[in-house]
A protein has these predicted regions:
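C-terminal helical subdomain
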Residues: 191-196, 203, 211-251
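Catalytic loop of short-chain dehydrogenase/reductase
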Residues: 104, 142, 148-173, 178-187, ...
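Rossmann-fold cofactor-recognition segment
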Residues: 61-77
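Substrate-binding pocket helix/loop in short-chain dehydrogenase/reductase
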Residues: 84, 109-111, 118-120
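Conserved glycine-rich Rossmann-like NAD(P)H-binding loop of the short-chain dehydrogenase/reductase
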Residues: 37-54
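Conserved NAD(P)H cofactor-binding loop of Rossmann-fold oxidoreductase domains
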Residues: 101-107
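Conserved glycine-rich cofactor-binding loop
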Residues: 16, 23-25
Length: 251
């Protein structure tokens, strides 16, 4: 997979792309990057002040029309999912992309010591919300020229790791969800489904999981942008591989 080519600014003009967890970390950098290339990003987050901040940054630098969706994914249910779908439907001609990026770590703990409340919160935020958003938002993608659903993965999705608890389990389940959607959606629609493992990246979640690690030794989240541009480009149309892992030579 070679990403060493230039994307033309504006190639995402008039595309409407939802980014969950858009107010910080990887989601924030991806939202800014997609806006730079012309996308009207639907900014999801939990904190209104953080959403207002990235909204203001986008409209001050780019000629795009972002939308704010404030929602705690831990509390997302079918009624709220329908409400989000209605807001997007009323404000866009169609939905071109869903980037399921938002996630929480919960805590680093053995299974024996894991409390049920944290367990459920992690699974609700990382897994169940993705199921609900895909269920209610994919109908809005019918008229998109090149619709994409992108899940954010992790190394613990493919191999369980001690003390990663509910987070690892949620990511393994998300990987399975993406594979199921690939088989269910791709033969019947233009939708392509990808699962992307960004690797070790300088984020607050990474700092919490690895407190002794030097953050300056990690790549910045902005270095992931080329992958997301590729997902939405025609170059990904005939790609057979759907589980993509970060490779430094492509950034």
């Amino acid at each position: 997979m070679n990403l060493n080519f230039e994307f033309e600014e504006g190639f995402l003009d008039k595309k409407h792309i939802l980014v969950t967890g858009a107010s910080k970390g990887i989601g924030r950098e991806i939202a800014l990057g997609l806006s730079k290339f012309g996308a009207n990003v639907i900014l999801h987050g939990r904190r209104e002040d953080a959403l207002d901040e990235i909204y203001d940054e986008i409209v001050s630098h780019y000629k795009t029309d972002p939308i704010i969706i404030k929602c705690d994914l831990n509390l997302l249910d079918e009624d709220k999912s329908k409400e989000i779908a209605e807001v997007i439907s009323k404000n866009t001609p169609c939905l071109d992309g869903i980037i399921n990026n938002a996630a929480i770590l919960g805590k680093m703990s053995s299974i024996a010591d894991f409390d049920l409340g944290t367990w459920q919160k992690v699974l609700n935020t990382n897994l169940t919300s993705s199921f609900l958003l895909v269920k209610y938002l994919t109908p809005l993608m019918e008229n998109s020229e090149r619709p994409r659903i992108i899940f954010t993965s992790s190394g613990v999705a493919t191999k369980g790791k001690a003390f990663w608890g509910a987070y690892a389990i949620s990511k393994a389940a998300v990987k399975s969800l993406s594979e199921i959607l690939q088989e269910e959606l791709e033969p019947l629609s233009k939708i392509k489904v990808f699962n992307f493992d960004p690797g070790a990246t300088r984020t607050s979640m990474r700092a919490y999981a690895y407190p002794a690690e030097d953050p300056s030794s990690l790549k910045d989240a902005s270095s992931l942008l080329n992958y997301y541009l590729w997902f939405f480009s025609a170059k990904s149309e005939n790609k057979d591989i759907r589980y993509i892992q970060y490779n430094a030579s492509n950034s």
